[in-house]
Amino acid sequence: MAALQKSVSSFLMGTLATSCLLLLALLVQGGAAAPISSHCRLDKSNFQQPYITNRTFMLAKEASLADNNTDVRLIGEKLFHGVSMSERCYLMKQVLNFTLEEVLFPQSDRFQPYMQEVVPFLARLSNRLSTCHIEGDDLHIQRNVQKLKDTVKKLGESGEIKAIGELDLLFMSLRNACI
């Protein structure tokens, strides 16, 4: 019994020492609460479901038929400008969250029946990326996302339709960046 207590005590002391070292490491960084791991990953199987993939692309196609502004691209090279490959999933998480909250939820009564199936799927992806963070400064990413938001808002309802019409690009960009 004494040996078991000594073993448990040693384990607890080791855990305490490790915790103290971790706390010291954070203090040395100036107290920055940078995450240990980014959690910016999605399972490949999320993008291998033919039915929901088809519905996502059909929704995008239907909305793009209503999009009369062919001069503007929301999800393209400009969005990724200055963003490293390792930060792209975080960027796409930000775009996904904006698209859900500011575009899809308010427009949920349109483009049926696709919308009612695609929105919950994208919301699940957003939920799975909820712990996705990057270490350090994300100002360059926030700037790029803000430009996208400003473009959508400037275009009004036409911008929202354009964002829905680019759900296929959002889907592919999430897949490329997050798996």
UniProtKB/Swiss-Prot annotation:
What protein is this chain from? Interleukin-22
Keyword set, alphabetical order: Cytokine, Disulfide bond, Glycoprotein, Secreted, Signal
Example of a GO biological process term:
inflammatory response
The record's subcellular location field reads:
Secreted
PANTHER family reported in the protein's UniProt record? INTERLEUKIN-22 (PTHR48488:SF1)
Give the Pfam families listed for this entry. IL22
Glycosylated residues are N54, N68, N97
User: Can you quote a single GO CC term?
Assistant: extracellular region
Per its database record, what is this protein's job? Answer: Cytokine that plays a critical role in modulating tissue responses during inflammation. Plays an essential role in the regeneration of epithelial cells to maintain barrier function after injury and for the prevention of further tissue damage. Unlike most of the cytokines, has no effect on immune cells. Signals through a heterodimeric receptor composed of two subunits, the specific receptor IL22RA1 which is present on non-immune cells in many organs and the shared subunit IL10RB.
Please state the protein's primary subcellular location: secreted
Q: Name one GO molecular function term.
A: cytokine activity
The disulfide bonds in this chain are: C40-C132, C89-C178
Q: Which family does it belong to?
A: Belongs to the IL-10 family.
Signal peptide segment: 1-33
Q: Which PROSITE patterns match?
A: INTERLEUKIN_10 (PS00520)
